[in-house]
Amino acid sequence: MSTRTVVIEGPERLEGVLHEGAGIGGAVICHPHPLYGGSMWNGVVDAMEEGFSKAGFTTLRFNFRGVGRSTGRFDEGVGETEDLVAACRFLKGVVSGEAGVPACGSMALPVEGVLNPNLAGRSVIAGYSFGAWVASMALARVAWATDLFLVAFPFSSYQTGEIRAFSGRIHLVGGSFDDISPLDDLLALHRDLKGEKRLKVIPASHFFEGHAGEISEFILESFREEEG
């Protein structure tokens, strides 16, 4: 499998990194808050990308506007939602070969030839902290998303209505010592969700120091359970 730097065209020009997977599902991963040093090279984002890649997904991580080589400036989540929609459109084009975007070589495999046939057609929007909120805000604009994977959703700053309205599979990760994403709020959200859902509580703070690998493991566990 190969990894390459890509440019995502949208309202801004965004830098991203595409990793071709062994299956025919795709996962877009959003980084934490740009004004607090968040970028696609964050350690938790690394762990998420590792987990999805090992599960067989083609992954796309990218920098929001104003971060790294991405053009533009921070836009309070409004422009960042547009960035995510553009990234999702780009990855969909890669996976399907639409819109003149070259399809990944592994995407040409028949379903019975992929690492996990049950990932066929699975499309994940994932995010950490601020990126988790942006992921939820984009759901109404990305009709093909089948899964939402949220790490440390910042309940202290943002509402959860879009998450509750999502009809696909929802995967939640939180730290038991997180004061930005309080555990009580996470458990309440998980309890209230009516559809298919998964929860992982890790003994960590908001930054998951020394525990990021548990996020990768949870991704593998979640999707391996759906094999066969």
Predicted regions and their residues:
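Acidic catalytic loop of the alpha/beta-hydrolase fold
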Residues: 176-181, 207
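Serine-hydrolase catalytic machinery in alpha/beta-hydrolase-like enzymes
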Residues: 7-105, 110-111, 116-120
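Gly/Ala-rich beta-loop-alpha elbow adjacent to hydrolase catalytic centers
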Residues: 127-135
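Catalytic histidine-centered segment of alpha/beta-hydrolase-like enzymes
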Residues: 72, 204-216
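Short beta-strand/loop motif that positions the catalytic acidic residue
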Residues: 166-167, 171-174, 178
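Short alpha-helix in the alpha/beta-hydrolase fold that links the catalytic acid
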Residues: 168, 182-190
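Catalytic active-site module of serine/aspartate enzymes centered on a nucleophile-bearing elbow/loop
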Residues: 212-228
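Catalytic histidine neighborhood in serine/cysteine hydrolases
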Residues: 193-207
